[in-house]
C-alpha cells in the first residue's frame, strides 16, 4: 500500500469518526470537547434571545417590559402582511416596520418568505438530503467545519451542548452546501450565518436560506466568498467615493496616513454583522439586510465613518487595522433603536444621492479568470520589506475596474551602498502585483505577495499553488517569508552586473521549501515573529518598514 492509499484511508477514517460523534449526540465527545458546563436549570439564566448567562438575570426593567409589550402589539401587523404578501412585499410599509423591529416569533416565517425558501424546496425535492449524504462521504474539510461548529454561538442555549442537536444540523448544512456550491465551498463565515438561520428555521429551510442568500442577485453575498470578488471591489470603490464626498476631512486623513483601502469598514463589515455585536442587534441588522438587500451595506459603512469621525482623524499608522475594527464594533455598543434610527436616516440620504449601491460591474468583474488587482486610493503592498511606489494622479469616479493590458508599477528609488540611488521599474506579475523577483531575475520563491481586496480571510490572489483557495483561513496563513540580506543587496549587485542580470532572468526559478508543504500542514502553522507581520491583524509598526515604504 503506497502513501496515497494510506493517507486516503486515514482521512476516510477521520471523517467517519467525526460523523459518528455527531450521530451519538452530546455525550459522544471527549471531556475537553464538551465546552462550557451546562446549568442544571435554565429558568432564570436565559434571556429572551436564548443567551445563557452565568448568573441569574435581574428582573425586567420598565424599558424592557415596554419593549416586550410593543413587540406583542406589532405581531398582529406582521401577521396581516404575511397573509397578503403580494400586496406588501414591495411596499414602503414593510421597510418601515423592518426598521422598527421584527417580532421574534414572526422572524422565521418572514425570513422564509423574503428568501423564497418554499419555491426552492418545490423546485429541488430531495436535493438537500442527497447533498448532505454526499458531503458526509466525500467532504475534504470536515475537520475545519467541525472545529468552527464547536465555536459557533456557544452561549446560545441551542448550541451550548457539544455534538447536540443544533450542532449536528449545522454540520449537515455546511457539508451539504460544500457539495452544492463547489465555487464557494466552505468559509468560516458560513457557519455563523447558517447558525443564525437555524435559530428560527428548520434544518432544510436553513440550508435553502443559505443558498438563496449567496446566490440571489438582491443580496449578492457570494461576491464575498468567491474568487471573483466582484461585490467586494464594487463596494470598496463606492465606499471610497461616498466617504470622500460626505466626510472629506476623514478621508483626507486616511489618505495621508495610508489607511484607505485595507482599513476600510468593508473589511470587517460581514464579520461584524455576524459575530461582532450583541445578538439582538445582529438579528435586527440582518432583518434590514434581508428586506433592503445590498443597499443596506453602504449605509452601515457610512454610519461607522460618521459616528467615529473624530476618532478616525486621530488614528495613526501604528496598528490601524486593529484600532479600526475595535472602533467599528464600539459604534454598535449602544441602544438598538438608536442604531436603526441612524441607519434609516443614512439610507434615505444615500438613496437621494444615488450612492446606496455601487455602479454596475464591468464584464470582466464577474469572470472567473485571473485578473489584475485594481488600483485603489492608498492601496499598498502588504508584505514586509516591499517598497512603496509614489501615488499616481487622482482618478475620477467611477474609476475603471480592470485595465486592458497588464500595467507596470511606478518607478521607485533603490538605495545602494555608497549613497548611489537607482530607479527601478518592476513588471507586474501574473496576479497584477509588482514582482521584484521577476525584475531582478531572482528566485520567485523568495517573495510572497498577497493582494488584500479589503475582506479578511478571503484572499483572491495568492501566488502559491493556484490563484485562490476557496477554504483558505486568512488568520492562520498570513505569514510572509523574511527578506534575506542577499535579497536586499540583489538590486545593487545586478545594477553593477547587467550581464548576470539578463542571464539570471532566463534561469529556471529555484523551488521554495514551503511550496511543497501540504495545504493542511501549512494551514496549521502560526505566524512566527521572524516571518514578517501578520496581515490579519496588521499590527505594523513604522519601524518595521524600510525608509521607502
Curated annotation (Swiss-Prot):
Q: Where is the composition biased (Low complexity)?
A: 398-417
| InterPro entries the record matches | Rab-GAP-TBC_dom, Rab-GAP_TBC_sf, Rab_GAP_TBC_domain
Q: Which UniProt keywords apply?
A: Cell membrane, GTPase activation, Lipoprotein, Membrane, Palmitate, Ubl conjugation
Q: Which SMART domains match?
A: TBC (SM00164)
- PTM note: Ubiquitinated by a CUL7-based E3 ligase, which leads to proteasomal degradation.
Q: Which domain of life is it from?
A: Eukaryota
GO terms for MF = GTPase activator activity
Report the transmembrane regions from the record.
Answer: none
Question: Which Gene Ontology cellular component terms are annotated?
Answer: plasma membrane
- Chain ranges of the Rab-GAP TBC domain: 101-293
Other remarks on record?
A: TBC1D3 is encoded by a collection of very similar paralogs with multiple copies of each paralog, some human genomes encoding well over 50 copies depending on ethnic origin of the donor.
What's this protein's name?
A: TBC1 domain family member 3F
The species this protein belongs to is: Homo sapiens (Human)
Amino acid at each position: 500500500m503506497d502513501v496515497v492509499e494510506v493517507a486516503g484511508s486515514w482521512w476516510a477514517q477521520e471523517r467517519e469518526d467525526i460523523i459518528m460523534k455527531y450521530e451519538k449526540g452530546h455525550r459522544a465527545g471527549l471531556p475537553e470537547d464538551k465546552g462550557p458546563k451546562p446549568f442544571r436549570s435554565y429558568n432564570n439564566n436565559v434571556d429572551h434571545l436564548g443567551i445563557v448567562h452565568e448568573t441569574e438575570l435581574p428582573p425586567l426593567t420598565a424599558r424592557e417590559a415596554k419593549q416586550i409589550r410593543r413587540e406583542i402589539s406589532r405581531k398582529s401587523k406582521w401577521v396581516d402582511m404575511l397573509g397578503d404578501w403580494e400586496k406588501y412585499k414591495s411596499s414602503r410599509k414593510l421597510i418601515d416596520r423592518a426598521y422598527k423591529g421584527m417580532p421574534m416569533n414572526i422572524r422565521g416565517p418572514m425570513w422564509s418568505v423574503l428568501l423564497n425558501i418554499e419555491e426552492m424546496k418545490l423546485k429541488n425535492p430531495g436535493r438537500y438530503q442527497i447533498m448532505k449524504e454526499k458531503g458526509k462521504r466525500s467532504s475534504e474539510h470536515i475537520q475545519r467545519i467541525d472545529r468552527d461548529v464547536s465555536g459557533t454561538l456557544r452561549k446560545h442555549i441551542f448550541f451550548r451542548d457539544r455534538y447536540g442537536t443544533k450542532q449536528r444540523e449545522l454540520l449537515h448544512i455546511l457539508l451539504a452546501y460544500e457539495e452544492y456550491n463547489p465555487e464557494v465551498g466552505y468559509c468560516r463565515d458560513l457557519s455563523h450565518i447558517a447558525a443564525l438561520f437555524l435559530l428560527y428555521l428548520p434544518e432544510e429551510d436553513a440550508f435553502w436560506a443559505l443558498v438563496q442568500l449567496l446566490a440571489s442577485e438582491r443580496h449578492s453575498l457570494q461576491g464575498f466568498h468567491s474568487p471573483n470578488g466582484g461585490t467586494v471591489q464594487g463596494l470598496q470603490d463606492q465606499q471610497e467615493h461616498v466617504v470622500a464626498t460626505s466626510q472629506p476631512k476623514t478621508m483626507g486623513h486616511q489618505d495621508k496616513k495610508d489607511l484607505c483601502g485595507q482599513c476600510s469598514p468593508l473589511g470587517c463589515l460581514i464579520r461584524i454583522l455576524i459575530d461582532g455585536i450583541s445578538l439582538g442587534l445582529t438579528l435586527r441588522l440582518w432583518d434590514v439586510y434581508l428586506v433592503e438587500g445590498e443597499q443596506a451595506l453602504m449605509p452601515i459603512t457610512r454610519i461607522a465613518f460618521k459616528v467615529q469621525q473624530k476618532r478616525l482623524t486621530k488614528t495613526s499608522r501604528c496598528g490601524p487595522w486593529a484600532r479600526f475594527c475595535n472602533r467599528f464594533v464600539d459604534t454598535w455598543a449602544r441602544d438598538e433603536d438608536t442604531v436603526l434610527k441612524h441607519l434609516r436616516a443614512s439610507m434615505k440620504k444615500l438613496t437621494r444621492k444615488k450612492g446606496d449601491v455601487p455602479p454596475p460591474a464591468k464584464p470582466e468583474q464577474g469572470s472567473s479568470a485571473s485578473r489584475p488587482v485594481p488600483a485603489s486610493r492608498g492601496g499598498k503592498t502588504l508584505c514586509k520589506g516591499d517598497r512603496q511606489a509614489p501615488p499616481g494622479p487622482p482618478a475620477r469616479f467611477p474609476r475603471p475596474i480592470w485595465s486592458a493590458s497588464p500595467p507596470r508599477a511606478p518607478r521607485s528609488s533603490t538605495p545602494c551602498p555608497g549613497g548611489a540611488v537607482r530607479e527601478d521599474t518592476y513588471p507586474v506579475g501574473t496576479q497584477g502585483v509588482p514582482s521584484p523577483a521577476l525584475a531582478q531575475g531572482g528566485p520567485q520563491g523568495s517573495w510572497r505577495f498577497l493582494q488584500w481586496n479589503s475582506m479578511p480571510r478571503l484572499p483572491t490572489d495568492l501566488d502559491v499553488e493556484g490563484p485562490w483557495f476557496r477554504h483558505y483561513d486568512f488568520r492562520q496563513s498570513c505569514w510572509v517569508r523574511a527578506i534575506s540580506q542577499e535579497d536586499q543587496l540583489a538590486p545593487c549587485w545586478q545594477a553593477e552586473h547587467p550581464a548576470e542580470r539578463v542571464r539570471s532572468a532566463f534561469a529556471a526559478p529555484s523551488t521554495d521549501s514551503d511550496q511543497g508543504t501540504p495545504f493542511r500542514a501549512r494551514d496549521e502553522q502560526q505566524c512566527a515573529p521572524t516571518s514578517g507581520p501578520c496581515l490579519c491583524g496588521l499590527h505594523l509598526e513604522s519601524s518595521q518598514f524600510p525608509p521607502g515604504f
